């Protein structure tokens, strides 16, 4: 029995992803529910830990909605972590203050890799419960985005056992034992597709795949070990539910050189970091995909008038909208935890105000 969610009042974000006409350029921010907000920090304290926050649907709902109560954003994104997936695979996720995520049982040898299996999604029910609860609490204000890490980005953490400056362990496996790396990536691809589909079933109205570390790979290697598996995911992710289109976004940080290939991965939109010229990107992809991005998050430490100037540059770089074009304004990566919350108000208002003339 379908859950009777409220009708959507603001579908601007979804329309932009599908390259349909909009009155203005919609916007949201990667990590918009996060540590830069005092209300997030208060909820995080109540939850007791990051995992206490992410694994509790009530807390996850609360923090997902916090930026929407403060700013006129055009989408909500599920509050979760990409590493919930390898955690469900039995790698033992934990967090160390000041060091970030770690795994108790990283994939360091053939035995560990061969034992890796696609997990039962029941162990991620807390994520799907959060999706349904958030969608219900949104009451149709804006669409809800579900997400996952890409197969390669998840593999980086699974092999390294945490974050890394140089990815030497995972790259050594990639070059020395490509068979083991392909086994990990194939397992991840099957899991990520199922995970995104379960989020769609739970109420997500769009989905995004974060390939945060794709840009760490060499040309040629990226295509084999990251792009190929994102394409595998996209082949199996639902594009509609109950007759309604579910748009998808892929984002490789540092992937500007491969934009032409990423545009053919099977997603509706491609995210860009701040190193890419948006106008040149639009010319390159044509009307194959919408684009998302790509303001440097550090601009939010500047004065309000400078923020408005840089917003206008991004909007003008994309240019006037035409049939078949689509742009979702976003940062080129996640918002910094040190960002002044009032800078985000300036950003959101500037995007909405300055973009209207480009949609006339």
UniProtKB/Swiss-Prot annotation:
Gene3D superfamilies: 3.20.20.210. One of its GO terms (cellular component) is cytosol. Pathway: Porphyrin-containing compound metabolism; protoporphyrin-IX biosynthesis; coproporphyrinogen-III from 5-aminolevulinate: step 4/4. The keyword Cell inner membrane does not apply. GO terms for biological process: protoporphyrinogen IX biosynthetic process from glutamate. The keyword Lyase applies. This is Uroporphyrinogen decarboxylase. NCBIfam families: hemE. CDD domains: URO-D. Catalyzes the decarboxylation of four acetate groups of uroporphyrinogen-III to yield coproporphyrinogen-III. Homodimer. It comes from the Bacteria. Substrate binds at residues 31-35, 81, 157, 212, 333. Its EC number is 4.1.1.37. GO terms for molecular function: uroporphyrinogen decarboxylase activity.
